[in-house]
UniProtKB/Swiss-Prot annotation:
Binding site for S-adenosyl-L-methionine: 29-40, 69, 90, 152
Any one biological process term the GO annotation gives: xenobiotic metabolic process
Protein family per UniProt: Belongs to the class I-like SAM-binding methyltransferase superfamily. TPMT family.
GO function terms (MF aspect): S-adenosyl-L-methionine binding; thiopurine S-methyltransferase activity
SUPFAM superfamilies: S-adenosyl-L-methionine-dependent methyltransferases (SSF53335)
Protein name: Thiopurine S-methyltransferase
Organism encoding this protein: Canis lupus familiaris
Domain of life of the organism encoding this protein: Eukaryota
Gene: TPMT
Residues engaged in binding substrate: F40
GO cellular component term, pick one: cytoplasm
Subunit-level organization: Monomer.
N6-acetyllysine modification, residue list: K58
Reactions catalysed: S-adenosyl-L-methionine + a thiopurine = S-adenosyl-L-homocysteine + a thiopurine S-methylether
Length: 245
């Protein structure tokens, strides 16, 4: 597909009916880590986050930054190295342990008292805390509120039927003056079942528009050879910034 046409004429599907009943269990996500099917992990970090980092941080220091469905995202180390406090949640203990190992960070682990079976992993420096549990159980742990949320690979991974519940949790974690950066993918959902799931702008506005000003910072063509196996011929990533109304 001609790239110019992709950007100008790409179809926004009005809803996600075709994917709405798609469900992945937590066990299936854990199995992806075990079997190394983690194509969503970006070893060099996210290019658009790097590009718009100043817009996101606004030159502020000592921020609390939340990473939903964090995996072993290298960006967590970026923020910690800049003096910010990072909190993430991830269902895969393997993913969390790999993060600390690959970033050469020592850590402690202890049970999450409020969540049976859950664990919290903390860097020895104290500025990275990763909760190993379901995101939907996280509110029971009372993790406080955040100045920034970096949502890449989270909203697009949540089962479509859980999005409203997810958005409610995310918004409940925001402090006054928050900045929420969201990356989503645009493709033809009739050709690929997901995940990652297709999240149209109308859905984003429905989920977050009552509380947030929503601004699309950038759209980029991210189509690669691997995407042909999905049955699609284009995929566009969109970066949104949410701020307090």
């Amino acid at each position: 597909m001609d790239k110019t046409r992709t950007f100008l004429d790409v179809k926004e599907y009005p809803d996600t009916e075709v994917q709405k009943n798609r469900v992945l269990t937590l066990e299936e996500w854990q199995e992806k880590w075990v079997s190394r099917r983690i194509g969503f992990h970006q070893e060099q970090g996210h290019k658009l986050l790097k590009k718009h980092l100043d817009t996101f941080l606004k030159g502020e220091n000592g921020l609390r930054v939340f990473f939903p469905l964090c995996g072993k995202a290298v960006e967590m180390k970026w923020f910690a190295d800049r003096g910010h406090s990072v909190v993430g949640v991830e269902i895969s203990e393997l993913g969390i342990r790999e993060f600390f190992a690959e970033q050469n960070l020592s850590y402690t682990e202890e049970p999450i008292v409020e969540i049976p079976g859950g664990k919290i992993f903390k860097s020895s420096s104290g500025n990275i805390s990763l909760y190993c549990c379901s995101l939907f159980d996280l509110p029971r742990a009372n993790i406080g509120k955040f100045d920034r949320i970096w949502d890449r690979g989270a909203l697009v991974a949540i089962n479509p039927g859980d999005r409203e519940r997810y958005a409610d949790i995310m918004l409940s974690l925001t402090r006054k003056g928050f900045h929420y950066l969201l990356a989503v993918l645009c493709y033809d959902p009739t050709k690929h079942a997901g995940p990652p799931f297709y999240v149209p702008e109308a859905e984003i506005k429905k989920l977050f528009g009552s509380i947030c000003n929503i601004h699309c910072l950038e759209k980029v063509d991210v189509f690669e050879e691997q995407h042909k196996s999905w049955g699609i011929d284009y995929i566009i990533e969109k970066l949104y910034l949410f701020t307090e109304k």
